[in-house]
């Protein structure tokens, strides 16, 4: 078994999107894995738990023996068929378990005996995860970061689509970063969020990029937490402020969080099932702000929202939503933003309308390319 191939070129695995077969238990895969990995576990969650208990009570030899009993005979044959089928689809796939130990060694040997020899990843999941954490830490420390900020509804996410050096943190988190930021389909685990972000930065730095623009975010984007080194770098980074009138921002919010999001719910769940989910999404998002708004303001906003939802349900129009959106900006989001910006004015390097900010980013990018 010791003569079967190992690979430790972790950078190449992620730069080339090498397919991976994850041999850990399903519960381990759910907590975090890698974008190009497929879960084909050696043991189920229950089998793994039994082996773990045996190890604690009777030691390693007994645990290994139990593992072979649980995954033997027809069970072994069935799982071997699954690994072989996957390797027929992805013949260059690599094998890994948690530490690159017995589980991946066992499967590698069984595959070898079946006539297929594939490398396993030295150090397994733990080593690959450490590599990606280090990648994030180095990017935070070594790259030049600029933060795009602006009042709620300024369309910052849309602006970044036109910025060459942009990194879409909210895209990786599958969340728009506010009380109303939840998207249908849920969020990735925090580990998966970090892994995808690290792989993007690894690839882009490998191509020679070292300056990035991100949207102003709190530490939490929904349930996804920004890595401490990256968040710290963002808190010290130069700021570009985009100025957009409130009426335009209210319209942008109506478009993004009402019109477009309803279409996403409708596409995912159908109109009949999707409507109550969409209405609950808006109502619940506002309810999460109740403590900060106060009871009276929350009641007023909720009444306006329910009127708008009723009209949307009856006629399909969404213009009534502008009433509660504008009031929420006036009462909550705009004052909060102005207070926060007042604490970091010394970091502002540019301020202007959307196109002026986009031109600034383009000029910065061109200057770095020439330099």
Curated annotation (Swiss-Prot):
GO terms for biological process: tRNA wobble uridine modification. InterPro entries: Rhodanese-like_dom (IPR001763), Rhodanese-like_dom_sf (IPR036873), SelU (IPR017582). Residues 14-137 form the Rhodanese domain. It comes from the Bacteria. PROSITE patterns: RHODANESE_3. Keywords: Selenium, Transferase. One of its GO terms (molecular function) is transferase activity, transferring alkyl or aryl (other than methyl) groups. SUPFAM superfamilies: Rhodanese/Cell cycle control phosphatase (SSF52821). SMART domains: RHOD. It catalyses: 5-methylaminomethyl-2-thiouridine(34) in tRNA + selenophosphate + (2E)-geranyl diphosphate + H2O + H(+) = 5-methylaminomethyl-2-selenouridine(34) in tRNA + (2E)-thiogeraniol + phosphate + diphosphate; 5-methylaminomethyl-2-thiouridine(34) in tRNA + (2E)-geranyl diphosphate = 5-methylaminomethyl-S-(2E)-geranyl-thiouridine(34) in tRNA + diphosphate; 5-methylaminomethyl-S-(2E)-geranyl-thiouridine(34) in tRNA + selenophosphate + H(+) = 5-methylaminomethyl-2-(Se-phospho)selenouridine(34) in tRNA + (2E)-thiogeraniol; 5-methylaminomethyl-2-(Se-phospho)selenouridine(34) in tRNA + H2O = 5-methylaminomethyl-2-selenouridine(34) in tRNA + phosphate. Its EC number is 2.9.1.3. The active site is at residue 97. Belongs to the SelU family. Involved in the post-transcriptional modification of the uridine at the wobble position (U34) of tRNA(Lys), tRNA(Glu) and tRNA(Gln). Catalyzes the conversion of 2-thiouridine (S2U-RNA) to 2-selenouridine (Se2U-RNA). Acts in a two-step process involving geranylation of 2-thiouridine (S2U) to S-geranyl-2-thiouridine (geS2U) and subsequent selenation of the latter derivative to 2-selenouridine (Se2U) in the tRNA chain. Monomer. NCBIfam families: PRK11784.1-2, PRK11784.1-3, tRNA_sel_U_synt. This is tRNA 2-selenouridine synthase.
